[in-house]
Amino acid sequence: VMVFKGNGHIGIDYVSLLPSTVWGDPDKYRNGKLSPRIVKALKDCHPSFFRFPGGCVVEGDEVFDNQYKWRNTVGPLETRKQIANTWGYMQSYGVGFYEYFCLCEDLNMAPLPVLHVGLLCQIRVGEQRGEGYRRIMPGTREFKAEVIDNVADLLFFAKGDVNSPHAEEAYWANVRAEMGHPAPFALEYVGIGNENWGTEYFENFSACMM
């Protein structure tokens, strides 16, 4: 129960209704928390891999700002920037990529993170609304920052060495370590793009691989 006395305005940014007992080592899960009941249900399925965060939510709709951006999902909860996502509701990032990698490790699942390839949802934007396939063009600074560096930084976060002489690798590896996991995660696969097709996708994908 929350009781407020006096006059004024109160802004509530984040509310969690998780049970008092949560999944996992509290030192490992210092920020985002997982419900033991949901984790048990997942464990009982004996999954061999886990694709996250899903599909169309990665791509964004209308504007690139509502693409799922993994960098906003790590670090302390209070610093995780929420967005209005593709599905039309606020994405809290209460569970982000760090918690995802930890859960895969706990349940012996191979992680399969999905990152955007610089294309807005082709079904919604291109087919349903007839606005064409809107994308970030390869060869631009925006493409490097939003697509290429986005993939590289995730690899640094998951597998990077905290003592690396490469500044970006060391930075993201230390973000991981400060969250409770100094050792690298086991990551072998990355999905770039979701249910995309056509020249626009193949050009963006190829540019990301160069």
Task: Indicate residue ranges for each PLM-predicted region.
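Non-catalytic accessory regions flanking glycosidase/transglycosidase catalytic cores in CAZymes
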Residues: 1-210
